[in-house]
């Protein structure tokens, strides 16, 4: 799983003073989705995670300055925080996955996730990857020949397979 925070925006509200919303990009199993969270949600997550796993430091809560440079530093800090939680923990708590709106993640530890493969095989070579698919609208082998001339190569191969004892023409 990869997590990035590519951007943030300032929201103004009639009921309360403005706040910053961070856009989180989550890449998992070849799929990408976005989640938007306020700093207060990050802080609440951090408090809960501290009780069950090793957590890195979270950027300071008290930033009264809405200067874009300060908010950019907070964005980078929160991105580093999320990435560190992923790197430092073999199993991610459901609480963390729910925060990122991740619905399914194998619960096996990384070391046991490929139990049927040879243990000497590297983790990189055992990962599945998505490959493009070539799609034919019609079966190219069933279509009529483009010309009236016989296909000499195909006839020769078929003749060799089915009539090996006969001499070619």
Curated annotation (Swiss-Prot):
Main location: membrane
Residues that bind a 1,2-diacyl-sn-glycero-3-phospho-(1D-myo-inositol-3-phosphate): 38, 40, 61, 74
GO molecular function: phosphatidylinositol phosphate binding; phosphatidylinositol-3-phosphate binding; phosphatidylinositol-4-phosphate binding; phosphatidylinositol-5-phosphate binding
Modified residues (N-acetylmethionine): 1
Key words of the record: Acetylation, Cytoplasmic vesicle, Lipid-binding, Membrane, Phosphoprotein, Protein transport, Transport
SUPFAM superfamilies xref list: PX domain
The UniProt record lists the keyword Acetylation: yes
Membrane topology note: Peripheral membrane protein
Keyword NADP (UniProt): no
Domain PX: from-to ranges: 1-125
Subcellular localization(s) per the UniProt record: Cytoplasmic vesicle membrane
GO cellular component, one term: cytoplasmic vesicle membrane
Biological processes per GO annotation: protein transport
A family per Pfam: PX
Residue positions where Phosphoserine is found in the record: 113, 116
Domain writeup: The PX domain mediates specific binding to membranes enriched in phosphatidylinositol 3-phosphate (PtdIns(P3)).
Family statement drawn from the similarity comment of this UniProt entry: Belongs to the sorting nexin family.
Function: May be involved in several stages of intracellular trafficking.
Full protein name: Sorting nexin-24
Natural source organism: Homo sapiens (Human)
């Amino acid at each position: 799983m990869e997590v990035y925070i590519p951007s943030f925006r300032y929201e103004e509200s009639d009921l309360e003073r403005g706040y910053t919303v961070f856009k989180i990009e989550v890449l998992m199993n070849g799929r990408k989705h976005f989640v938007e969270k306020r700093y207060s949600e990050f802080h609440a997550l951090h408090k809960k995670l501290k009780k069950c796993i090793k957590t890195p430091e979270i950027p300071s809560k008290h930033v009264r300055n809405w200067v874009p440079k300060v908010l950019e530093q907070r964005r980078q800090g929160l991105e580093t925080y999320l990435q560190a939680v992923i790197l430092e923990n073999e199993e991610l708590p459901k609480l963390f996955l729910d925060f990122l709106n991740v619905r399914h993640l194998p619960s096996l530890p990384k070391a046991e996730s490929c139990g049927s493969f040879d243990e000497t095989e590297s983790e990189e070579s055992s990962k599945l990857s998505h490959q493009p698919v070539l799609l034919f609208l019609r079966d190219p082998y069933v279509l009529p020949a483009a010309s009236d001339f016989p296909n000499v190569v195909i006839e020769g191969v078929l003749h060799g397979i089915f009539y090996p004892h006969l001499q070619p023409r």
